[in-house]
A protein has these predicted regions:
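N-terminal cationic and glycine-rich segments that engage phosphates or anionic surfaces
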Residues: 2-119, 126-492
């Protein structure tokens, strides 16, 4: 009897802890009206983006008997990164893809590779504004090129392996002016509308607007994998085969959950380098030192996204050229440079690996870290300030970048590796989608919690100023109260 009472008390304690956890991390946040407005504003713009993504371009008819972008690797990646608007060939079909491509190119350009852009990036707010103008100009160019390629590809049947025409232009709109000018500029306008929504989310909502809209596209496309898996393994089966199908489906769900947990661990993992400040005194314990946190994956998910666009977009143009002007050379390239073919898979994996290392070194901003060390009289114990510190940090960041390069290469290429082994493409969840799902979710939750804490501190400071009097003087001069306050304060 006591055994069952103990089990019951443990179960009740478990659920009470879960309730307290949600109350602490989620419910309390919604009591903050300012934060609640930001969250609701973000959700509203996400709904607007999804709604616009269901509106097909004027003058076009989407053929419902084919899966839009089925069998084409570029458009599957394009649809995920762009925000999912390509499914219905909507007003926002291009999504944020042109803007992301331009932003990554400008990230490369702000290094020593392009000295004028590097000087602009170091010239303060004025230079930052000029870089933004250049980024938007590149976005317009990329959006126009991608719009023409997408329209021509979908209307000629080059978007899938069966050469089926996925989009039909209605007879009254089937004119060169409409195809080559009106439709492309509508898609370009849709891209800048999407950028506008993302900027509003960044400024007035929660999280990074670009990441939130990409996450929206992932959330839209992700359920289809589970539906396809259910139909594949369970479907209309009965008896023993049904049991085996249920087991396979459960294993599939568990495998996805394990991958998500692994990605979560790698996303939050960091290398802590202990720091010492001149004049503070040397601490005997490492745990008492401040530290420099370096992300285990400093480049994030951008290497996979950029490598995907870099490798697949030229192949999409090659596919379109082969439709217009067939030749043995273009046919061979289409056959062998697909991502699920050995040559294409190797090129894709090597691209992810090299871009990860480059972006990892670029995003770490080593020169800025060393400069701050010199200004604040900070040094790493056992390492001399100056060139030795810079060399030490470079070696650490390079090792982290190489490790994350292997990690991202496995995640990005595994989808096409399993496809090359014969697995159905509609059952293989993209590692890119899972990385985006996990990283954006964690970063958004952390930003919500940070805003909640900062607003609470601001509110507490205001209340302290208003109530400052004899009682607060007594509290400030009481050593015991002062010690408790310091111990419970938040360093911001």
């Amino acid at each position: 009897m006591n055994f069952f009472k103990k089990i019951g008390s443990n179960i009740s304690l478990f659920f009470s802890r879960i309730i307290l956890f949600f109350q602490k991390h989620f419910i309390d946040h919604f009591k903050n009206k300012v934060l609640l407005k930001r969250i609701l504003f973000t959700l509203f713009l996400m709904v607007v983006f999804v709604t616009v993504g269901t509106l097909t371009l004027p003058g076009l008819k989407v053929n419902q008997d084919t899966s839009l972008s089925g069998g084409n690797e570029f458009f599957n990646i394009f649809n995920t990164i762009g925000g999912g608007g390509l499914r219905q060939f909507s007003l926002v079909s291009l999504g944020l893809s042109p803007f992301i491509t331009s932003s990554i190119i400008m990230t490369f350009a702000q290094t020593k590779l392009v000295p004028p852009i590097q000087r602009l990036s170091q010239s303060g707010p004025h230079g930052r504004i000029k870089i933004n103008y250049i980024t938007y100009g590149l976005t317009f160019v990329f959006a126009l090129v991608q719009a023409i390629v997408v329209i021509q590809t979908f209307t000629t049947g080059a978007a899938n392996n069966q050469n089926q025409q996925l989009v039909t232009i209605l007879d009254q709109f089937n004119t060169p002016v409409f195809i080559w000018f009106v439709l492309p500029f509508i898609l370009v306008a849709g891209t800048f509308f999407t950028i506008f929504i993302s900027e509003q989310i960044t400024n007035k909502g929660v999280g990074n607007g670009t990441s939130i809209l990409i996450l929206t596209g992932v959330l839209i496309t992700l359920p289809s994998y589970f539906i396809n898996a259910y139909k594949h393994w369970i479907g209309d089966l009965t008896g023993k085969k049904l049991f085996e199908g249920v087991i396979s489906f459960v294993v599939f769900i568990i495998s996805v959950a394990i991958v998500i947990l692994i990605i979560s661990f790698f996303h939050q993992a960091e290398r802590k380098i202990p720091l010492q400040h001149i004049g503070v005194g040397r601490s005997k314990h490492v745990k008492d030192l401040s530290y420099l946190p370096l992300k285990l994956n400093p480049a994030g998910v951008m290497p996979i996204i950029f490598a995907s666009m870099l490798v697949t977009f030229p192949m999409m143009i090659t596919n379109l050229v082969n439709q217009k002007f067939p030749s043995p050379g273009t046919a061979w390239m289409i056959e062998n440079f697909a991502l699920h073919k050995p040559i294409g898979l190797v090129i894709y994996a090597v691209s992810i690996f090299l871009i990860t290392i480059f972006l990892g070194l670029q995003q770490s901003r080593l020169d800025k870290i060393v400069e701050d060390f010199n200004k604040n009289s900070t040094f790493i114990p056992g390492i001399r300030p100056g060139e030795q510190t810079e060399a030490y940090l470079m070696a650490v960041i390079l090792r982290l970048s190489i490790f994350s390069a292997f990690y991202l290469t496995i995640l990005g290429a595994s989808q096409y590796f399993f496809q090359a082994l014969g697995s159905p493409p509609n059952l293989i969840i993209s590692g890119t989608s899972l990385v985006i799902l996990v990283s954006v979710s964690i970063e958004t939750i952390q930003q919500i919690q940070a805003r909640h804490k900062s607003q609470n501190i601001f509110k507490t400071n205001n209340q302290t100023k208003k109530s400052f009097g004899f009682s607060s003087l007594v509290k400030a001069t009481n050593p015991q109260n002062q010690q408790n306050d310091n111990g419970g304060s938040i360093l911001w």
